Amino acid sequence: FANRWGGVFTTMQNYLYFYIPLLTMSLVSKELSSGSIRLLYSSPITNTQIIVGKFFSMMIYGLIMIGILFLITLCSWAVVKDFELSMVLTGLLGLYLLICAYAAIGIFMSSLTSYQIVAAIGTFAVLMVLSMIGGWWQEYDFIRDVTYWLSMPGRSGKFIAGLICSEDVLYFVIVVCLFLSLTIIRLNSVRQKIRFVITLGRNIGVIFLACFLGYLSALPQMKLYHDATSTKINTLTPNSQDIVAKLDGGMTITTYINALDPGSSWFAAPYFLKPDMERFEQYLRFKPDMKLKYVY
């Protein structure tokens, strides 16, 4: 299930990337192109109810998809000795959260145009940006934290590996709320003829709030973890935890770099600070005040 080179969940992630945008491209754009959106506007329901209703339909559809995988899980649990049920269930949770995030993004892009193909292409473009943004502007401290948090790759991978982190859970929740809010703002601006400047200000405010909450959730001191594997493969051994617990005060890991070596010096550039921190994530879990320092 969790094999990164062809496991069921890993393959499912790749399919979702292409399937969900095609599924959501008509949720709002078809209403706009056919004119049926006017019927919704004239009915006694708010734009929030319209969008939340469409999102709930995608959530239910996602549950059906996950339910099929759950049946496969039950069959495997019944015939495989020492089956890692809790780990596989954690992977299912990660896939479901990924479906919800993709659906929210797709609904937003569908609300921007009456052309379904354009909505699908726009969704692919947003997903591509979220896949690449983790490597942008890594030279600046605060921006590095925000852009790296916005990056989507690997989020559901941690669930598939059996590790639940509060940062990843909040990431999906914040992304869903962000794009649903942007969709509601978009429909309100059309329905109520709101000025462009006001709509732009609301969009910027929502995006800023989402980035700020994401920045807080990514702080090591704010993270909570649960290792669902039976062998606790994602957690330090008890002996290692005892050693880390005995370290009083802060801890700084200093890396000395030979800047004249073109083959390895670039690994210590600010661009690689976040990947470096991920290597020590198991230690950061028990020593959140640990810092990295580079000497050139």
Which stretches of residues belong to each language-model region?
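Secretory targeting signals
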Residues: A2-Q13, V52-Q116
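Long, hydrophobic alpha-helical segments
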Residues: G7-K30
